[in-house]
Design a protein with these regions (language model features):
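Nucleotide-activated donor-dependent transferases that construct or modify glycoconjugates
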Residues: 3-20, 46-47
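Conserved small/polar residues in nucleotide/adenosyl-binding loops
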Residues: 248-251
Length: 251
């Protein structure tokens, strides 16, 4: 592989838009470090409902918004917003939708109750990022996915979007964290994630109902590298990545 000059970051959390955490700090600092090495970056995260748009100066990018993504036979408008972290000279794109992200937290609500449609939210987020990158006509060399909400991106990149100029030559890296959800995903999850170019065979041993470990293993199947970013990660995921000779443990 030639030198990675363009890096796409797809993550769940970035400070200062959400509270500091292991993932949010990496989501903030790693893209800046890569950019300071002279690389070109694009960074995406969901527009969670607890992000203050006025304080963080988010604004909609009209030319990128307006597409409808069909999930479970329902149209869901894709809204793209953008903001800048001035101290890092870094721009962040936000994937937004009234049904999935407005007035809603991350995995669970303020009472700790996990959202029943987390599977659909993950499908929308992954597809929303990839469709936006296509519109930008930008071709990353490396795509670095952080956290379970991004776990479908490797499958989509390597199957549904494999012939797209923006993605056909990209290498995919998946970072796992201690960010597991407790409930299983909906019983029709496999049907929801299907797109042209993806067959049931491509889902391997994915059996419903799908839990956190199974979702992350699906990401491992279609990644070129896996990074363990938290000390405490489901051991079955780590062993699965190790058997695939893909695992790198972050120092």
């Amino acid at each position: 592989m030639t030198k990675a000059n363009k890096v796409l970051f797809i993550t769940q959390e970035i400070t200062p838009y959400v509270s500091e955490s292991e993932m949010a700090n990496i989501g903030r600092n790693l893209p800046q470090a890569i950019q300071e090495k002279g690389r070109e970056i694009r960074t995406f995260m969901p527009k969670w409902g607890n992000i203050n748009e006025r304080r963080n100066q988010l604004h909609e990018v009209i030319r990128l918004s307006g597409m409808n993504l069909i999930i479970d036979d329902t149209d869901h408008p894709l809204i793209i917003k953008v903001a800048s972290i001035q101290s890092a000279r870094m721009q962040v794109y936000f994937i937004d939708n009234d049904d999935y992200f407005q007035n809603r937290m991350q995995t669970a609500d303020e009472n700790g109750v996990e959202y029943e449609d987390n599977d659909s939210r993950a499908v929308f987020y992954a597809r929303g990022v990839l469709e936006t990158v296509k519109k930008l006509r930008w071709c990353p060399d490396v795509i670095h996915c952080h956290g379970w909400m991004t776990a479908l991106a490797p499958l989509y990149i390597k199957k549904a979007y494999k012939d797209e100029p923006s993605f056909r030559d990209a290498k995919v890296v998946f970072s796992v964290y201690e960010d597991d959800f407790k409930n299983t995903l909906s019983d029709d999850f496999a049907a929801k994630l299907m797109l042209k170019g993806i067959s049931k065979k491509d889902l391997g041993d994915l059996k419903e109902p799908v839990d956190y470990a199974a979702l992350c293993k699906l990401a491992v199947d279609y990644s070129d590298g896996v990074i363990q970013n938290s000390e405490k990660v489901d051991e079955s995921i780590i062993e699965y990545a190790r058997q695939s000779c893909l695992l790198y443990t972050s120092p």
